[in-house]
Amino acid sequence: WIMGHMVNAIEQVDEFLNLGANAIEFDIDFDKDGIAQITHHGIPCDCGRKCTKKAIFTECLDNIRQVTTPDDPKFREQLVLLALDLKLQRISSAKAYRAGEDVAKKLLDHYWQRGNSRARAYILLNIPLVEDYEFIRAFKDTLKNEGYESYNDKVGINFTGNEDLDKIRDVLEILGIHKQVWQADGITSCFARGTERLKEALEKRDTPGYNYINKVYAWTLVRKSIMRRSLRLGVDGVMSNNPDRVIKVLKEKEFADKFRLATYNDNPWEKFRG
């Protein structure tokens, strides 16, 4: 999976897909009451990027619904995964439950259209810190209460704050989540990051019977040397400001026979068995 990073303006969706991304990540900003308002990262952000692009969240969902719906004029077959980077660290943890309710309802109304949409992308909920786990509980409660619990099959969980992996496992255990879990490891493209935690996540992913990590991705990679390093370690995905660079690396002799771009037929919740 090649995730286009910080795709917050509607016009950026096609831009990143044209560069080769098959997944996009966008930032969801909340008001003080936990209501999702806009897709917006803000300052600071990655080096070489404009941090201020934005869109109304519901308008973003309406557009992406079209882009991921077969036979729609806007349909782009390659876009199979949406990563929602939830900026919960900007609001009180006490509002995390309200935020989860709101995002679930907006997805129901604007993306899935309560069963009337054929939009098919998988959705990854990126939670910044384990202290905000009530967002996940609220999201699942809302799908159940609204009568659309089946959409859980399309939704995965990912904690992005580089926290202790055992601590993350404990929270997932509290929530009763034993599947559909991704694990991110990374840092802004402005800085270098070692591989110790990334290797630990990959080791846990590959441990038989360990159900708290199904996929691992590294972020935010812009240098080809770091992309190569991550691929050699065996990551499932790369988040990048430059998907075209990832495409070029994947075509290199070392990787061409080992990796390919994920398609809709690849289940993002299953561990890869090479």
From Swiss-Prot:
GO CC terms, sorted: extracellular region
Known EC number: 4.6.1.-
Any GO BP: killing of cells of another organism
Disulfide bond sites: 45-51, 47-190
Cofactor(s) the record lists: Mg(2+)
Localization annotation: Secreted
Coiled-coil intervals, chain numbering: none
Example GO molecular function: phosphoric diester hydrolase activity
Cofactor stoichiometry and binding remark: Binds 1 Mg(2+) ion per subunit.
Keywords: Cytolysis, Dermonecrotic toxin, Disulfide bond, Hemolysis, Lipid degradation, Lipid metabolism, Lyase, Magnesium, Metal-binding, Secreted, Toxin
Catalytic activity as recorded in UniProt: an N-(acyl)-sphingosylphosphocholine = an N-(acyl)-sphingosyl-1,3-cyclic phosphate + choline; an N-(acyl)-sphingosylphosphoethanolamine = an N-(acyl)-sphingosyl-1,3-cyclic phosphate + ethanolamine; a 1-acyl-sn-glycero-3-phosphocholine = a 1-acyl-sn-glycero-2,3-cyclic phosphate + choline; a 1-acyl-sn-glycero-3-phosphoethanolamine = a 1-acyl-sn-glycero-2,3-cyclic phosphate + ethanolamine
Superkingdom of this protein's organism: Eukaryota
Tissues where this protein is expressed: Expressed by the venom gland.
Membership in a protein family: Belongs to the arthropod phospholipase D family. Class II subfamily.
Role of this protein: Dermonecrotic toxins cleave the phosphodiester linkage between the phosphate and headgroup of certain phospholipids (sphingolipid and lysolipid substrates), forming an alcohol (often choline) and a cyclic phosphate. This toxin acts on sphingomyelin (SM). It may also act on ceramide phosphoethanolamine (CPE), lysophosphatidylcholine (LPC) and lysophosphatidylethanolamine (LPE), but not on lysophosphatidylserine (LPS), and lysophosphatidylglycerol (LPG). It acts by transphosphatidylation, releasing exclusively cyclic phosphate products as second products.
Protein name: Dermonecrotic toxin SdSicTox-betaIIB1biii
Source taxonomy: Eukaryota, Metazoa, Ecdysozoa, Arthropoda, Chelicerata
